[in-house]
UniProtKB/Swiss-Prot annotation:
UniProt function note: Involved in unsaturated fatty acids biosynthesis. Catalyzes the dehydration of short chain beta-hydroxyacyl-ACPs and long chain saturated and unsaturated beta-hydroxyacyl-ACPs.
One Gene Ontology CC term in the entry: membrane
Similarity field: Belongs to the thioester dehydratase family. FabZ subfamily.
InterPro entries hit by this protein: FabA_FabZ, FabZ, HotDog_dom_sf
Predominant localisation class: cytoplasm
Cystine residue pairs: none
Reactions listed under catalytic activity: a (3R)-hydroxyacyl-[ACP] = a (2E)-enoyl-[ACP] + H2O
Keywords: Cytoplasm, Lipid A biosynthesis, Lipid biosynthesis, Lipid metabolism, Lyase
Active site per UniProt: 61
GO biological process assignments: fatty acid biosynthetic process; lipid A biosynthetic process
Record keyword Magnesium present: no
An example molecular function term from Gene Ontology annotations: (3R)-hydroxyacyl-[acyl-carrier-protein] dehydratase activity
Protein's name according to its UniProt entry: 3-hydroxyacyl-[acyl-carrier-protein] dehydratase FabZ
Amino acid sequence: MNAKDNETAEFETTADLAMIQRILPHRYPFLLVDKVIDMVRFKSALGIKNVTFNEPHFQGHFPGEPIMPGVMIVEALAQTSAVLVGHSMASADEDVSVYFMSIDNCKFRRKVVPGDVMSLRVETMRGKPGGKVWKFLGEAIVEDTVAAQAEFTAMISFPQAAA
């Protein structure tokens, strides 16, 4: 299959938990994307995270006033982008690993608490099929309000060819 065929090949625009677990190495308690409800190949994704009191970070952050740590919100955005790139590359016959490299312009605007449903919207700012460094813009949205936003960079690692 050549690159032109890959661009027009059938692309599944959603990802359930089983597909996410095939793409990401993360597992409980660190898998922070429940499903992806929309993807545009190599361009954007909309993930969902159902925030529950059963998550271990709420035991200490903060007793009596559980608030999702900002770093976990950013990680959920990064995982959503990894699902986007991993699924896009897999549909192009390339398995990849995606590693978080840097974060810029991060802002937290609203508390995220147990019971919230977080929409994780990520868009590719820079990156192309076969490229090793990608940059994303991410927003975590709760009840139509931006809870957090950030720009972040990821490195794509391609498996070594068999000798």
